[in-house]
Amino acid sequence: MFTRADLEAREAALLPPFARRSSEARRAVPEAPSETRTAYQKDRDRVLHTKAFRRLEAKTQVFLNAPALGDHYRTRLTHTLEVQQVARTAALSLGLNETLAETVALAHDLGHPPFGHAGERLLDSLMRGHGETFDHNSQARRIVTLLEERSGEQPGLNLTLDTLDGLNKHGRAALPPTQRQPSLEAQVVDAADALAYTAHDLDDGLRSGLLHPEDLLELPLWRELQERSGVTSQRPSSADLRTLQRELLGWLIGDLTRSSDAAIAASGVASPDAVQAHAHRLVTYSPALRGHLRGAGDFLRERLYRHWQVEREVYQAEQVLTELFGAFLTRPALLPPRPRSRVGRDGLPRAICDHLAGMTDRYALETHAALRG
């Protein structure tokens, strides 16, 4: 039987000095260590058992109400699990703390509202009308520190400070000296997130028929992928798509780990603090592949995320959330007891926003229909 002390000793023996170690993890509220689990393993398990994590199953990735389109389109939950798998693979390859990377990956999208990025933009717009903002990264941190509860004694999950730091997104590869870079484990999750949604949104777009293989030929990423995979058909079969998806993931993960390993070695960082003080991120793709991914992201925005059929769904989502927000704002008594109890602490607009952000697509539509009668 391996005890927590055994697992921590194994980390000390195997992990390089720039990786995070669970034995050094701290929490805002100290608690007794587990006999069998490391601090990061406890964090991971707490995230997995939250209501917010379970609700990801019925939240949009790209296509609203994806189950109505078919059983194989990705939801926010399947995307999260795919990010977890990529992050764990890359972290292991780079000698990082894979449990911390896995935990941050599982928690990184907890703050997404219903209806995907359309819902996020709409809630942010509504909150700005009340002098506040909304973004899913801040909401994820709010969920694990305030809204979810393990016990009646304190709000939140009391996750380690390392996990909480991993939920703070930093949008630029180079930061001002006053800001610290994320840990390498958190950087891996950011890279895995971009990798997963690029690869899998292309796949879902093709399967939906909103994207066509011939359209993708304008992408250098796709042309090189065809050469690598040997799949050049303009009408790829389901088996061809699986081959392309497998080849794309292997290519991206391989490039990420090789480029990051070289960048870490060249940087000379010898501690987690040195990583966070570094001027640039060290988990990165090769310059060529970074260009390919930027091109793919631009392509997806124009051809898939702004496709007229997707835009119709976005319009419906905006109407639903706008009307729900307005109804709860004018008649707070319509709020269920739990969000209503938070009005005194957080203010009415934020209590409404938290309630709406926690909804699944299905529950938002059902609530909207019920209020309209």
Curated annotation (Swiss-Prot):
GO biological process: dGTP catabolic process
GTP-binding among keywords: no
Family matches, as SUPFAM superfamilies: HD-domain/PDEase-like (SSF109604)
Annotated spans, Disordered: 21-43
Residues in HD domain copies: 76-198
PANTHER family documented for this protein: DEOXYGUANOSINETRIPHOSPHATE TRIPHOSPHOHYDROLASE-LIKE PROTEIN, DEOXYNUCLEOSIDE TRIPHOSPHATE TRIPHOSPHOHYDROLASE
HAMAP family recorded: dGTPase_type2 (MF_01212)
Family: Belongs to the dGTPase family. Type 2 subfamily.
Name this polypeptide is given: Deoxyguanosinetriphosphate triphosphohydrolase-like protein 1
